[in-house]
């Protein structure tokens, strides 16, 4: 970027990433309306070609798929990142009558940034005065659920999870689905708003939905719903800009990121976050201790509860939907990490461990946990209770430090629930395959089925550059066992900051893992897309194969590397086997031959029946006089 470009205000120059706003091939955005006109749930409809006459010649119903891309892939919406996305939820929040609009920001740091003239060129131009719960009110989705109230957000996610399942069944898109094995989950045949309410009231699911993030398209995280994935973005002291982080956001949600965590640790964290939230249709999570550490110039010992509290309020007023809080890193657990191969690998965990040792005091996040809950329920920020002592190598998996912290997270979950604050639990990490099930079982036991949210886990440590694969294996397994959300890992894990291509690779890898888990659990409708793609593959409908896939661009590119001509996209073979050895083509020929034989057999059988009837009519005598 030139000096002249830098001098121009970002609120004047910022542009949307053009790659992120193109509709996916042969797809269109559709909206399913709820009980009121302003509940419009987005889905992506993939149109399919007719089955060729060689295969029976029939119409193929379009396939609906879950869509996280927000308005960015709707050609009817004008996207301007300088203004942010349109309002989705304000009318719902206003109707509840339990919030108030503040006259200004109430965080000291937020006010400092707002009044700093030097930041004017970087600042999002349309900063709104925040909302907060009225005195004595609790505005969390869990609180409403426990009052028996089905909110607009709950109805929205029920429609979104259900994906017009009844229509899909009627269209024959779900004639086959294998029974799943859900390890004791309570997955219904159909997701209803009442089921959503019950799950949230029980604490088995959360809808991360800060009242200050009104651009949000609500989604749900819980073991009895579709497995979700999270993508991480964020700058560091070594690089990246606000524009790049917003581009990563829009790129990530295009490919299926259900939530996004902003893990910025570099310059202008506050301003970067404002741009991200105002342009995000998915929940945004943060680790507030990262920013708090920046405020004390990276000296963990200088952190205070007062500074951290102000950081929570600052971020809650911007609209952060969930906070990772490392309140389970207790002083007594720190020595348990001394003999580990990789010690404490969590940034948040190491920060709090260092503070505890420096002051020889208990973790202030733990001692002030009730006060944190008071802040959370005033804005409906969900907890993501951080696993600060997660294993950073398979050698350290399932040790006393990890499971000791998990037990504490279970205690904290119950405290959060007493405040009607939504809560999920973060998990490892690096765990070999044979130890993954124990992690899930122990989390369900300790945390009473609160949603589990894991980083992988990575199943081996030997593949730097391929940790999206080592972790995708573990993610599929733990998703099947009951994990509600999977935090993606990119090929750059342990090596560097991911770029756009790395983000896409990580997300597609984790979409595969999450979908495989949904199939294995037996989530209703999970097999619709598989069935449609398999049918397209057998019928050599190449374009439909590409378009039904998670990444149409890559599928088309790989096909065209060896068969670039357009005629190859209607050919009844591919480059793998060629025209004479294509198993699909041979199978079709076998079917045609069998159909002919069947016709002959029917004719013969009919003739035999006629002769048999004549034999009986003539007295059933073996010999007849001529």
From Swiss-Prot:
Lineage top rank: taxon: Bacteria
Cofactor note as given: Binds 1 [4Fe-4S] cluster per subunit. The cluster is coordinated with 3 cysteines and an exchangeable S-adenosyl-L-methionine.
Gene3D superfamilies associated with the record: 6.10.250.620, Radical SAM ThiC family, central domain
Keywords, ordered alphabetically: 4Fe-4S, Iron, Iron-sulfur, Lyase, Metal-binding, S-adenosyl-L-methionine, Thiamine biosynthesis, Zinc
Any one annotated GO CC term: cytosol
Residue positions binding substrate: 232, 261, 290, 326, 346-348, 387-390, 426, 453
Cofactor: [4Fe-4S] cluster
EC id: 4.1.99.17
Binding site for [4Fe-4S] cluster: 574, 577, 582
Enzyme category, top tier: lyase
Gene Ontology BP terms: thiamine biosynthetic process; thiamine diphosphate biosynthetic process
Biased composition (Polar residues): 10-25
Statement: the UniProt record of this protein carries the keyword Transferase: no
HAMAP family reported for this sequence: ThiC
Subunit comment: Homodimer.
Function of the protein: Catalyzes the synthesis of the hydroxymethylpyrimidine phosphate (HMP-P) moiety of thiamine from aminoimidazole ribotide (AIR) in a radical S-adenosyl-L-methionine (SAM)-dependent reaction.
PANTHER family given in the database record: PHOSPHOMETHYLPYRIMIDINE SYNTHASE, CHLOROPLASTIC, THIAMINE BIOSYNTHESIS PROTEIN THIC
Annotated NCBIfam families: PRK09284.1, PRK13352.1, thiC
Protein name as annotated: Phosphomethylpyrimidine synthase
Organism: Pseudomonas entomophila (strain L48)
């Amino acid at each position: 970027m030139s000096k002249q470009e830098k001098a121009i205000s970002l609120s004047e120059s910022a542009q949307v990433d053009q790659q992120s706003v193109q509709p996916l091939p042969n797809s269109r955005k559709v909206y399913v309306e709820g009980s009121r006109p302003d509940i419009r749930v987005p889905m992506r409809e993939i149109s399919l070609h007719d089955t060729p006459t060689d295969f029976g010649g029939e119409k193929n119903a379009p396939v609906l798929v879950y869509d996280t891309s927000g308005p960015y892939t709707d050609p009817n919406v004008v996207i301007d990142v300088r203004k942010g996305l349109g309002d989705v939820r304000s009318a719902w929040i206003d109707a509840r009558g339990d919030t108030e609009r503040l006259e200004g920001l109430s965080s000291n740091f937020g006010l400092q940034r707002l009044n700093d003239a030097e930041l004017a060129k970087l600042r999002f131009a349309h900063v709104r005065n925040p909302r907060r719960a009225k005195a004595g009110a609790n505005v969390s989705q869990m609180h409403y659920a426990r009052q028996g109230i089905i909110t607009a957000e709950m109805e929205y996610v029920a429609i979104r999870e259900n994906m017009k399942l009844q229509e899909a069944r009627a269209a024959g898109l779900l004639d086959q689905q294998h029974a799943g094995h859900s390890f004791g989950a309570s997955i219904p045949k159909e997701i209803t708003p009442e089921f959503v309410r019950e799950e949230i009231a029980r604490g088995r699911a959360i809808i991360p939905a800060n009242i200050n993030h009104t651009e949000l398209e609500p989604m749900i995280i819980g073991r009895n719903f579709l497995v979700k994935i999270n993508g991480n973005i964020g700058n560091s002291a070594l690089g990246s800009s606000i524009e790049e982080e917003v581009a990563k956001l829009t790129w990530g949600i295009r490919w299926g990121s259900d939530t996004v965590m902003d893990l910025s640790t570099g310059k202008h964290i506050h301003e970067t976050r404002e741009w991200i939230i105002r342009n995000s249709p998915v929940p945004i999570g943060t680790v507030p201790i990262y920013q708090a550490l920046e405020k004390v110039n990276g000296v963990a010992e200088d952190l205070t509860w007062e500074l951290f509290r102000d950081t929570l309020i600052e971020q809650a007023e911007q609209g952060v939907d969930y906070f990772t809080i490392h309140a389970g890193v207790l002083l007594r657990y720190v020595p348990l990490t001394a003999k580990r191969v990789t010690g404490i690998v969590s940034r948040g965990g190491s920060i709090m461990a260092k503070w505890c040792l420096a002051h020889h005091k208990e973790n202030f996040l733990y001692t002030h946990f009730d006060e944190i809950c008071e802040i959370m329920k005033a804005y409906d920020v969900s907890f993501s209770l951080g696993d600060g002592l997660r294993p950073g190598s398979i050698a350290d998996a399932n040790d006393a430090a990890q499971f000791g912290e998990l037990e504490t997270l279970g205690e904290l979950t119950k405290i959060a629930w007493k405040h009607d604050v939504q809560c999920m639990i973060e998990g490892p990490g690096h765990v070999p395959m044979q130890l993954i099930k124990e992690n899930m079982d122990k989390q369900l036991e300790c945390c009473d089925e609160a949603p589990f949210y894991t980083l992988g886990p990575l199943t081996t440590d030997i593949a730097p550059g391929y940790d999206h694969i080592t972790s995708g294996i573990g993610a599929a397994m733990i998703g099947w066992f009951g994990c509600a959300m999977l935090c993606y890992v990119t090929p750059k894990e342990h090596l560097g900051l991911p770029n756009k291509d790395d983000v896409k690779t990580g997300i597609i890898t984790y979409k595969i893992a999450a979908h495989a888990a949904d199939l294995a659990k037996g989530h209703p409708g999970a097999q619709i897309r598989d069935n449609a793609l398999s049918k397209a593959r057998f019928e050599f409908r190449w374009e439909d194969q590409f378009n039904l896939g998670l990444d149409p661009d890559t599928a088309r590119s790989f096909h065209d590397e060896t068969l670039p001509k357009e005629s190859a996209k209607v050919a009844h073979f591919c480059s793998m086997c060629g025209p004479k050895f294509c198993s699909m083509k041979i199978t079709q020929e076998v079917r045609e031959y069998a159909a002919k034989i069947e016709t002959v057999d029917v004719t013969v059988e009919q003739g035999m029946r006629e002769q048999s009837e004549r034999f009986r009519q003539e007295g059933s005598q073996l010999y007849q006089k001529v």
